């Protein structure tokens, strides 16, 4: 979790991004997102640069000038403005600046998809790919292996997604393969799904059932959860026959487990204590 100082600095840059997005075309925002992510990659490779850009002995203007001198002509003006905003404010640690730059790039990618009207589909594609990976242990191990070159894993993911996902989804999967925010691959995918939902002002509910919910069942569940959380909920279903029946719902840290498997386990435990 970022320190308060870093969170505030990120918020300032994120607000600047929101202002930019409101007046820009989707394609321009997507280009800016790529610039931001390329600089995040640069910061990942250059620890000395990260340290210099958070050095409290330098003024914010000095740090911004340093970055502008390095990036001049290599990224677009909008990306440079966002990045100099990012480094001109205080960060608690070099790693948190890296996380902030990467998060800003992801936010820009999601905003571009939103402006293009594709964000709901991108969110679903990320979730479905995560389900495919989670259901195949060999594939999960290959894509999650930090010892394997990221480019090689990205090529594999791209082949799996070819013709099945939008380019922005593929790009976000590449970000996840890089360990977005220091997470595992599956953890990064989950976080990206949640950020996509948040961009649409929605909360994600992960639902596990023995058989797929019908349209009316899902509608009632969405209505109930939205009323509870005071925010529209988007349901992501996972089918697991082992739960036997009922439904398990996880929203953030809240877990509602009404599966038959849970009730059977509780009954077994109660009998074992007699």
Swiss-Prot record:
GO cellular component: plasma membrane; proton-transporting ATP synthase complex
Family matches, as Pfam families: OSCP (PF00213)
Domain of life: Bacteria
Cystine pairings recorded for this chain: none
UniProt key word Plastid: no
GO MF term set: proton-transporting ATP synthase activity, rotational mechanism
Annotated keywords: ATP synthesis, Cell membrane, CF(1), Hydrogen ion transport, Ion transport, Membrane, Transport
Location in or out of the cell: Cell membrane
Topology with respect to the bilayer: Peripheral membrane protein
Primary localisation category: membrane
Family as reported in the entry's similarity comment: Belongs to the ATPase delta chain family.
Function of the molecule: F(1)F(0) ATP synthase produces ATP from ADP in the presence of a proton or sodium gradient. F-type ATPases consist of two structural domains, F(1) containing the extramembraneous catalytic core and F(0) containing the membrane proton channel, linked together by a central stalk and a peripheral stalk. During catalysis, ATP synthesis in the catalytic domain of F(1) is coupled via a rotary mechanism of the central stalk subunits to proton translocation.
PANTHER family assigned: ATP SYNTHASE DELTA CHAIN
Name this protein carries in UniProt: ATP synthase subunit delta
